């Protein structure tokens, strides 16, 4: 006889076991950088470096004063060749005459040679012992230049005393009288105040006296 109709589907069977893991896919693109982390702790201090070379030795203030006096004398010889000068020494002795030359020639001169009105050499005086040089019957010449403070600057008690004198006598101070070696070596007003030297003048910048601030002893103002 004829085939009968297909019967209904049976119920689904149980899920089979998971198959084996497939191979890894290709690596994806790199993600964005994360935010910076916090700063780590400061490392330990490294060892000290080697000691540097010794710096230049400061000149003694007395030598620096002599250098300034020598510098000024070189200019006074050129600027006042026919004027009489009174040179006051730190001992209280005085010499006078025209300013002739510095001896020996060169940058290390230690003597000032005085000459008479005919240019004949008279006595020579030690630059190291000069308290002041006063040019009589002449006016201060603004062309005179001065050495700056040495580098490194002098130190010590002598340097303190020299600096104190300059501080005590600023430019414009009037009625000044400076004593050295038991005598007044300058009086008037302060027109220049430089390392190692003050310049004292009379009315209208007359009779300039170039005073070593290493030699000044008693100061009135």
Locations of the language-model features?
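Collagen/collagen-like triple-helix sequence repeat recognition
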Residues: 1-64
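Conserved RNA-binding domains used in RNP assembly and mRNA/RNA metabolism
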Residues: 56-221
């Amino acid at each position: 006889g004829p085939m009968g109709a297909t019967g209904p589907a049976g119920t689904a069977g149980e899920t089979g076991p998971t198959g084996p893991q497939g191979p890894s896919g290709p690596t994806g693109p790199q993600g964005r950088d994360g935010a910076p982390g916090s700063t780590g702790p400061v490392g330990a201090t490294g060892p000290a470096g080697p000691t540097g070379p010794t710096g230049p030795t400061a000149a003694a203030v007395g030598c620096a004063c002599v250098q300034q006096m020598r510098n000024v004398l070189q200019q006074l010889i050129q600027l006042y060749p026919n004027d009489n000068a009174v040179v006051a020494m730190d001992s209280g002795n005085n010499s006078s005459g025209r300013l002739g030359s510095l001896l020996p020639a060169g940058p290390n001169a230690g003597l000032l040679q005085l000459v008479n009105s005919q240019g004949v050499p008279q006595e020579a005086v030690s630059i190291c012992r000069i308290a002041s040089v006063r040019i009589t019957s002449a006016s201060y010449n603004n062309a005179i230049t001065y050495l700056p403070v040495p580098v490194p600057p002098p130190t010590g008690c002598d340097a303190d005393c020299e600096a104190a004198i300059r501080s005590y006598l600023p430019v414009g101070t009037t009625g000044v009288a400076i004593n050295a070696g038991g005598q007044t070596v300058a009086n008037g007003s302060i027109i220049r105040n430089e390392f190692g030297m003050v310049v004292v003048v009379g009315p209208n910048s007359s009779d300039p006296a170039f005073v070593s601030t290493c030699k000044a002893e008693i100061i009135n103002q």
